[in-house]
Amino acid sequence: KNKNKFLQSIETKILILGGSQGSKSLNLILPKALLNIEDLFIKHQCGKNNFEETEIIYQQYANNNKVEIIEYMDNIHEYYGWADIIICRAGALTVSEVSASGSLGIFIPLPWAIDNHQFFNAKHLKDLNAGFLLEENDNLEQDLIKILNDIKKIEIEKLQIMKENSYKAYIKNPEKKIYDEIAAI
């Protein structure tokens, strides 16, 4: 039986999404955390006004990882298909897209989102063993390093189950379900 581990002896592709505007806090914290993990190919969507600042931070914390910084991704579905792991916020659309792509998500909810809805979006997938949830606080950098190191120790089969759970959590044909509910009234 193949017991190969994820993130070992292969280049792991990580997609970082901070939303269409980017996330200054993720842009500052994630390059430092990812410095501690080797053999990564990172594509980081930083937001239109954050490119230079994000590039400087990656240069400051450079290691052997390949990094591509992108202001905005027009064809986001191609990036979802490319990634092994997606590190992102937990807005409803982003969580749905990660699930629909069957990707493994590490969700970092926006801490000041109304009614903490991003936390609950991410918690739903975490509770289904379909993703990881990290809270944005003073420990975020260390928590992310720990999760990525923990992922290194998990068997590929278990990670594949998490990806499958993520895809199963995606609500298929939501417009039909909404229509049916309205029509039933």
Question: Each PLM stretch: what is its role?
Answer:
Residues G81-S96, S103-L104:
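Acidic donor-binding loop of glycosyltransferase active sites
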Residues Y72, A92, L110-I114, D138:
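Short, acidic/turn-prone active-site loops that include or flank metal/cofactor-
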Residues E157-K172:
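A short, well-ordered alpha-helix in the C-terminal region of glycosyltransferases
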Residues G102, F119-G131:
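Acidic, glycine-centered active-site loop in nucleotide-sugar glycosyltransferases
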Residues C88, L104-D115:
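Short hydrophobic beta-strand element within catalytic cores of glycosyltransferases
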Residues I171-I185:
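C-terminal alpha-helical cap of glycosyltransferases
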Residues L128, F132-E157:
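C-terminal "capping" alpha-helix adjacent to the active site of nucleotide-linked donor transferases
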Residues K3-C88, F119-A122, L134-D143:
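Donor-nucleotide binding loops and adjacent catalytic segments primarily
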